[in-house]
Amino acid sequence: FTKLDDIGRVAVVTQNGRPILVSDVATVSIGPRPRSGIVAFNEHDNVVQGIVLMTKGQNATKVVEGIKAKIGELKLKLPPKLKMVPYYDRTNLVKHTVHTVVENLLVGAFLVVAILIIFLRNWQAAVSVAVVIPLSLLFAFVLMDVRGVSANLISLGGVDFGIIIDSAVVLVEALMVKLALADTGQFPQHANYSWRVHTLKNTALELGRPILFSKAIIILAFLPIFTFQRVEGKIFSPMAFTLTFALLGAILLTLTLVPVLVSYAMKNGDLAEKHSVWMDALQKNYRRLLGWAESQRKLIVVISVALLAITLLLSPRLGSEFLPKLDEGNIWLTITLPPSTAIEKTKEIERQVRAILNSYPEVNNVTTQVGRPDDGTDPKGVNNLEIMADLNPKDTWKFADKEALITDMEKKIHALPGVPTNFSQVIEDNLEESLSGVKGEIAVKIYGPDLEILENKSEQIANVLRGIRGATDVAAIKIGGQSELNIVMNREQMARYGINISDVNNTIQTALGGSTVNSFFDGDKRFDVTVRLAESYRDAVDDVADLPINLPGGNGIIPLGEIAKVEIKQGAGRISRENGGRLVAVKANLLGRDQGGFVAEAMEAVNEQVKLPPGYNITWGGQFENQQRALARLKIIVPLSVLMIFVLLFWAFRSMMKALLVMLMVPFTLIGGLAGLGLSGLHLSVSAAVGFIAVAGISVQNGVIMVEQFMEIMLKGKGLKEAVMEGAVLRLRPILMTALMAGLGLLPAALSHGIGSETQRPFAVVIVGGIVSGTLFTLLLLPMLYPLFADEARHKDEAGE
């Protein structure tokens, strides 16, 4: 067909020699398809929305820049009064997070270099060490490119320049001490340039093994992170790869480039350790402290163990979660009305909610989506309403934080009758739904065969969750409430008339839903020709019951009501299945409450108050499920990693007791790490767990440095007590330097409140706090306990011989 009149002139049937045309029995016109969705933007009730998706592995910034260029070209071709307005651009979040990371890295690098200059008091030595920072990072970037790891918030957020250069610091500091001893006449050789180069070579050879071992230990400590899967794997594996690559680069540079740079520095200047009054005073007081500690060994051990025990006992008060929420700078609000809600009613509620959100000065713009797009890529009903509110910068807000803003919004929206809410963020919402199939932080899934029982139990569980502190947006995902036109065929009547079920189904489908019978062309455009009963003939149950059904052989017609029962019934709006079984879900979000504590309390309450019949069971999902999966994997991998580190230490010391002594210092990092989380108001999370893994490696490294020094001095013939005292004092400066650099390197990230800092903070806070407590106990407890463990090791060696 090329014209509407062509359709109207089609003959349907011939009666008494006269053709009955389509135009005689029907109205032929161009009409819209039934509307399945509506999009609104700020004060505009109807707009056209376009969404651009990026393919996997592409650079988001470059892709968006290309899209913006194309939009600029399209704007020039648009008709007057028509404009294109981007309402959501994810690169804004990327830019803010990159700015936060770069700022933290630059400030951290500055603090690390400052510590170098303060402690080494020689700019040439400081430069020789500091050059490792950019070069090791460049080395890491090359390997990241080979491995396919992109530079972003996660991969760069865990880079600590203090950890990266500590081996170079140990090497240069040891050389400076030897040169200073030569200047004081403690070495018989004349301290000329060739002797200094020889000393440098010997120092590098002596420390090469401990440096390799210490860095291998830190890399081994990251082994559990490499085993993470799914979400936690995608988040933390890039960080582990980046830091590992940087450490490998640091080892290579420390053992090759740094000695070369130091040799040039020695040729052009004096690298001997400068006399420092404050360091002398610090070492003097440290020597006194060690002497006192030796006389109070039992008391210090008891106090240390008591502090650790108290910290562990108080740690459950911190609460737990999978990951801290990343503030995306937007609000994603989902409202699901009863399944039978018409699109007009949903649109009416949408206008009211949009007006409420637009009334907040914190909101930049509001985009709403009712139903689904025409292409069917997001198959939601017209009872579904999704709203994205882009937020202004926080320094313009009147509310203290986002939680307070959402709480106020909730109060106003809940004043509208029958409007449930689910507040989230754009990326967070997509992540939650893809993981558990439920839009909510906490998802409770009830499995069983009977939909009625499932719905009843889901309401009971929802009521229980509403009574638990911190729960918000609690709702059972409705499966019923969908009004259906139910047509039940009377097979006996149909057999009496000789009517086939397929013929009746085809008639009902054409009359109510319409059937495409042909096509209509208007130039290059193609339109479907659809036959359907006029609305006045299908507007009520009685109208449908009067639908004419042809009898076989053209022997007349009968109404549908003669052979079927037609009625309105309430049916299931959706039936969800998982692993072959039916399920109904209950979702909840949290405000001011940790996930772990909430779920533990909720589980106990549900088990007490909700009794399931045989054949039914409950699982807890959402972000809590991710947390449990990550912790379950850590319970397996961390002991294996600890065992591998212990084997490495045993190989280094040739003594099981010395290896055990170094490992005993690791738990004391928990004191500072957990205290840091508590003071910062942060929960225990997978991010914090990764921090504890990293700081454990740093603690072991410091222990190795000190024990190696004890062993080296004892090889020179000095007694055990003297070797411990002298070695501890000698290692005070490098241990303090490495600890301060490692801590200050991540201090900006620990204190940062910029966009994207949420995921970095627990990791950084744990490392900074853990380094503080770990260093204190390494400096005090390890020298005090070493004689006990060394004697034990010596007895075992003698027994072996």
Put a short name on every predicted segment.
Residues 87, 94, 98, 172, ...:
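Helix-loop junctions and hydrophobic alpha-helical segments within the transmembrane domains
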Residues 153, 201, 205-206, 213-269:
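Hydrophobic alpha-helical segments
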